[in-house]
From Swiss-Prot:
Record's keyword annotation contains Secreted: no
Domain of life: Bacteria
Protein name: Large ribosomal subunit protein bL32
Amino acid composition bias (Basic residues), ranges on this chain: 1-18
Annotated Gene Ontology cellular component terms: large ribosomal subunit
Lineage: Bacteria, Pseudomonadati, Rhodothermota, Rhodothermia, Rhodothermales
Pfam families, sorted: Ribosomal_L32p
Gene Ontology BP annotations: translation
Coiled coil: none
Region annotated Disordered, chain positions: 1-20
Keywords: Ribonucleoprotein, Ribosomal protein
Family per record: Belongs to the bacterial ribosomal protein bL32 family.
Length: 65
């Protein structure tokens, strides 16, 4: 089984990891057709519970807070 010959330094490890987080994109937001609040694409709205014009979940105060 292959084993690393030398230990990677903290700075080298952190440099490698930092590039991954810089490449991440924020989630795509769009306006809900029912209530107008911002929501994540292809997901039900947290505020009103609608998705593609249908009520799919009951909105609760816990989701909004």
């Amino acid at each position: 089984m292959a084993v690393p010959k030398r230990r990677h330094s903290k700075s080298r490890t952190r440099k490698r990891r930092s590039t991954y987080y810089n490449e991440l994109e924020p989630p795509q937001l769009m306006e809900c057709n029912n209530c107008g609040n911002p929501k994540v694409m292809h997901r039900a709205c947290k505020h009103c519970g609608h998705y593609r014009g249908r009520q799919v979940i009951e909105p609760s105060d816990e989701l909004i807070a």
